């Protein structure tokens, strides 16, 4: 969880969950209230007023879309609940929407979900028409790192050709050309 006032961080915390805590839930979607309440508890414990202009959550495994920031809507929520794969990231937009909906004039967003699809046609070839290319990668992290690197180099992400690897809870590699992972 992170709370910013403009570009100033007011709170940055990583909330971890034990296997035992999560084992009481048969499906990831059942963890919704648990995870939402932890966010609210963290805000309260740090005396952060529940008064926001926008709430952004980690994007889920919705239908493939280009990279960017998206406002949470009913179709996205439906796709997230009935996603092609089960992952905790599917709760990010749902939690953001629930929190935002309790505040006047507050909007909910996701950014660069793991299904960002910017592949060129040649990259879709798998060797068999029975095995279509499914694009799932750590887009949020990789694009953020690429943008930071570009700033440090005094240039724009869109002007660079890179190879980026995410080595965290999962592993993925992307080859962005001019700001689009191909």
Q: Where in this protein do the model-derived segments appear?
A:
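A glycine- and small-aliphatic-rich helix-loop capping segment at beta-alpha/alpha-beta transitions
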Residues: 6-9, 67-79, 105, 125-129, ...
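Short, well-ordered amphipathic alpha-helical segments that serve as non-catalytic structural scaffolds
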Residues: 34-46, 95, 145
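Short, basic, glycine/proline-bearing loop/turn elements
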Residues: 23-29, 78-84, 130-131
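Short, well-ordered coil/turn elements that cap or connect secondary structure elements
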Residues: 4, 10, 49-50, 103-105, ...
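Phosphate-binding/catalytic loop of phosphoryl-transfer enzymes
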Residues: 89-182
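Short beta-strand-loop/turn "lid" adjacent to the catalytic site in phosphate-handling enzymes
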Residues: 43-89, 115-127
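Short, conserved beta-strand segments within well-ordered enzyme catalytic domains
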Residues: 2, 54-56, 109
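Short glycine-rich, Thr/Ser-proximal phosphate-binding strand/loop in the N-terminal lobe
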Residues: 1-30
């Amino acid at each position: 969880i992170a709370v910013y006032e403009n570009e100033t961080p007011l709170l940055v915390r990583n909330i971890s969950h034990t296997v035992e805590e999560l084992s009481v839930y048969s499906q990831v979607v059942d963890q919704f209230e648990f995870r939402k309440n932890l966010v609210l508890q963290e805000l309260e414990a740090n005396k952060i007023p529940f008064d926001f202009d926008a709430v952004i959550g980690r994007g889920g495994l919705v239908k493939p879309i280009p990279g960017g920031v998206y406002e949470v809507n009913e179709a996205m929520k439906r796709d997230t609940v009935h996603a092609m794969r089960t992952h905790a990231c599917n709760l990010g937009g749902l939690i953001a929407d629930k929190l935002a909906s309790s505040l006047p004039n507050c909007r909910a967003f996701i950014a660069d979900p793991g299904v960002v699809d910017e592949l060129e046609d040649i990259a879709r070839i798998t060797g068999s028409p029975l095995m279509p290319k499914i694009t799932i990668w750590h887009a949020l992290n990789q694009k953020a790192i690429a943008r930071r690197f570009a700033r440090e180099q005094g240039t724009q992400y869109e002007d660079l050709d890179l190879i980026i690897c995410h080595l965290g809870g999962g592993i993925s590699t992307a080859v962005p050309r001019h700001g689009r992972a191909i």
